[in-house]
Amino acid sequence: MALLEPLSLYLPTQPEKTVIKAYNTYSKAERKRIMTQNPASFLHILGAGQNDVEPTLAIRWAYEKVLQSSAYQQYTPGYWVYQIEASDRTYTGLVAGLPLRAIQQGKLRLHEATFGARIAKLGAYLEDVQIQAEPIVAALSDAEQLQSLLEGKTVGKPTIEYTFNTRTHRLWQVVDVQTYTMLEKELATFNHCYLIDGHHRAAALQYVASRHLKTKPIHLLGYFLPEAQIKAASFFWFIRKLPKTFQATLFEKLGPVASCDANTLPNVHYPIVFRLHKQTYTIQKQGEWYPQLCELYRLLEESEPQIEFFPRKNKQSLTHSFAKKTPDFSCCYLPLSFAEIQKVADTHGQAPPKTTYLHPKLLTGQFLSPL
């Protein structure tokens, strides 16, 4: 039996006007401007419950209304080859469904811990709205044959093509019998995949399923790529207020710590750089540095501060990124490579939440999959 299965999806008829970035990346002013200027924006659906006493039910009604309109077209169950062309690279993968039973059997390998409160909140949301609007992203190992098959499909004219925020998006529906048969045969060779983005969404789907044991089989909407295409980045961690007494505990538990120039960037010798009360330090590498990152997160969590996160761009130092925020504590680190992530997942380990920031990131509202 193949790891992945075909899905019946709804796709927007005007994707360049409909799709959005992650909802939380828009400011209130941006959301208001877009919703005023663009009646087709997916923000209208997500904002439907903003002033409602039952917000998730209001969003569900907004979904039902839009799916009955001409804004979305329903397609027969199948696979979609999806290509994202960015300025620096091109991603080519497969949009398909990962059955819940595969997740329960451990075939979706995880590498990052999650926040329980967020899972419960997202699970309750999914339970009410009954729609998945953003795929998880997962990587497939030893997928050269699959990549060749997918790239062969991209030679033809795409079923859908549009540009959003300078990126070109192309979709090919797999409808010819020969390609479909070859694709299913190739998918049958995979026993598992690695979750790259969407740990909370995957956990929330299991939450919903656990509350409705007798419902129809549930699939996790996903975008599946060969591992070689995954691009690794990382987060900044910062804490606005941290007791000064925490410094002694931190230095005692972390091992060799050395002060350094404020603009020091993480490197192979000093993979973790942090700033504490306006002084910058590095943690010296001793064997694998990843356990030190886990220990740092644990110590911060035990002190009960509010840890905040945002993605780190290449070559950004702590002083560059926090010049206006001046938090008591900030940290940046080398991205974990896919090989390191794979090792964590294969040994059933867990990186701290918000440790890995991996590309590609997908749009919301491009694929709708009813539960």
Model-derived regions, located:
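Surface-exposed, charge/polar-rich loops and edge strands
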Residues: M1-L371
